[in-house]
Amino acid sequence: MQFSGEGLFFHSPFNSPKKHMFSSSKGLFRGHPCPSIAAGQFCRLLCCPFDHPERVKRESENGSDSAEMVKRRKLEVGQGVARVAGDSSGGKLELPGARQALNQRDRPEIEGVGASPKTEGGRAEGAEKKEFASSQSSQKEQQETPHASATPQASVSPQTSAPPQHVSSSVSEDVLKQGKNGITSKSEKSSVKQPGSRDIYQPSSSREPPVSSIDTRTSSSPKSALEAVMTTSASPSQSRDGSRNTSASPSSSRDAEHLMPTTIFPCPATVPQRIAYLKAIHSALTDKRKLKFPKRAAILEELAAAKRSAGNYMVYTNECRVLVKSIKDGSWRGGKAGGTKTDSKTSGHITSSISNQLDMLASKTKPLLAQNGYPVNPDPLKSGLPSNIGIQHCDRCDKAFDVPKVDNYGSCKYHWARARMGGNSTMPEKFYPCCNQPVGMSEGCEEAPRHVYKLHDLNDLAFVIPFRTVSTSESLDTSTSTSTSTSATTSAPSAKSTKTASRPASTPTKSLTSSLDLEKSRQPFNKARRPRTIFNGPAVNQREPDITLETMKRGIGESRGQADSQERSSEPRERSARVREQPSGSCDQAGSLQTSVVAVDCEMLYTSLGMELCRVTCIDYHGKKTLDRVVRPTGRILDYNTRFSGISDINEPIITESGEKGDSISFEEAHRLILKLINKQTILVGHGLENDLIAMRLIHDRIIDTSILYPDFNPRYKTALKTLALKYLKRTIQTGEHDSMEDALAALDVVKCHLKG
């Protein structure tokens, strides 16, 4: 806005500064002087429709348009628009944009109607635009078919330019309508064409001379130059006969001028910090890669790293460091950020550094397993199902009941959420989050048909269903554990050893295990056979059938003396080493043992034998599902625990990603499938895995538990997986019923985030 003595003037697309803002459209009082000015006073009206001496003087100097000139100008513009609309060649004449024409003080330049005024240097304004438009029209004429219309083009040379004139609002609206119908404006025609995302990562040509870059912050296009670069480049224009116009814009080969990061929300770091990492990425690209647009490539890669960080500074810094390292070592692929996603599905294996970090986390967790309730060494009690467990306390309402007569005790009223301490003045005492009632106020907010219980003592758990130790000898032959009695006898944990399972001396597999251990002790230590990577070989426990079966046939039925004599045979050492290591994991061509990582999550329900396994889910390090089945419990089902297990029917199959139905399996079949996936060297990842291992009745010491990895400030309680996923992954989980696949993937991603920084 601009205020003067005559009133208020407003710069807008629909009002020229030379016109009064509040003058009437018909000019009824244009020739009458203002009464206030005539009386010698100052006009205080902001919408005075009368004439003022200042405006009359200005119009006399600039020249006012008569009614005849206005009518003639309207007629000329209308004829030009009619010629353009009736041109059968598709409208070769170009009209400027309506908004641009209204913003200009002078008459807009319309080809075929008028020309632009001359500048101070004598050169016609817009002459360069006319030359560019004429060259474009000549190229289109060459591509036209012989059947094209021969209507002559209406063009006026720059020498016949008309004096500057005004354009009424009605004419501007007509120009705007015609522009929407296909008449392109010169501002749109001469817009800067930004290079596409594919062109950014093309190698630079030595023949092209360096050109000056464009500042992306001063771009006149609706989108910024960086956003235009991120999207796919526009397809070349097509003529009417279908031929593609491949003429590139003069500015399509220009790089960004400044290294300025793109603003995003939430921002993971400050602008100076992002600029520092952006310069490091650009320096790496300049030193190791010869790209056509190194600055634009650096800006896009830094923006991708900032988006992946989800506002976390530690994740952002690690993403940038990994990106710079991948560019320097040559593993980076332009436009795909392959170096920053080494632990995702885009990568086929994990580097040795990540494998070493996982081993270090597992070794730190191992001393803390016993105090966190993991089954380390339960006493080897006699296996078999008890006839009477006795009096137990309900796991929900804490009432005592007789397990065989549970149906006679009536319903169970309970609170499904744990009691919490009030953190404000409105709730200072303990309360239940499920109903916001203080502790002791009511019996419960939900009701179940019967009471349930859960065994906590490991000896009692081993008495109901025996534990099995995950070891090398367990995966030699899964067919030997078909019956419950045989598997229980051969897999009961020993009190003398916490690493391997205790087997009777009469077991045939014992001689083979002892012979392999003796052969292992005789061979010298070889550093080349140490684990180098994980998940870069075949599937876990994928072994050669001929060698394994032949070895088992030799081991079964032989005594210890026969096994010792067989060790001193002339069999090659390489073959015996391959046979010894094959069952415990996958081996590469060099014979080195591969360490695997499996994320596990189990769901449990209440039965007459306590809490049993009802669903097991296993995924690999890349998030691929390897096992997801519903397990039929051994005891009688008392409660499905649907709120936390997500199971409402034990016979309902699980639909896999391929569309196949996974029917429910028995507990013995679940054991067999689990032992195919894990071995002694496998690292199990999960949250609160002590409950999962107890439900699976497995003893394992290579564990990465996120509840131990991220302890809460209160030692009495552990941090929930939902809290960890929201804090480190910006992911909301467990909004409804628990999903074992969702929980396993969240725990695995939390561990990956911990490895990154």
Swiss-Prot record:
Region (Disordered): 56-259, 474-590
Polar residues bias spans: 145-172, 202-223, 230-240, 503-516
Top enzyme category: hydrolase
Cell compartment(s), UniProt: Cytoplasm; Nucleus
Top-rank lineage group of the source organism: Eukaryota
Exonuclease domain ranges (all copies): 597-751
Xref: InterPro entries: Exonuclease_RNaseT/DNA_pol3, REX1-like_exo, REXO1/3/4-like, RNaseH-like_sf, RNaseH_sf
Compositional bias segments (type: Low complexity): 244-253, 474-502
Molecular function via GO: exonuclease activity; nucleic acid binding
Keyword Kinase: no
GO cellular component terms, semicolon-separated: cytoplasm; nucleus
Bias kind Basic and acidic residues: ranges: 120-132, 543-557, 565-581
Swiss-Prot/TrEMBL GO biological process terms: rRNA 3'-end processing
CDD domains: REX1_like
Record keywords: Cytoplasm, Exonuclease, Hydrolase, Nuclease, Nucleus, rRNA processing
Enzyme Commission number, as recorded: 3.1.-.-
PANTHER family per UniProt: FI18136P1-RELATED, RNA EXONUCLEASE REXO1 / RECO3 FAMILY MEMBER-RELATED
Summary of the function given for this chain in its UniProt record: 3' to 5' exoribonuclease required for proper 3' end maturation of MRP RNA and of the U5L snRNA.
Family membership noted in the UniProt record: Belongs to the REXO1/REXO3 family.
Protein name as catalogued: RNA exonuclease 3
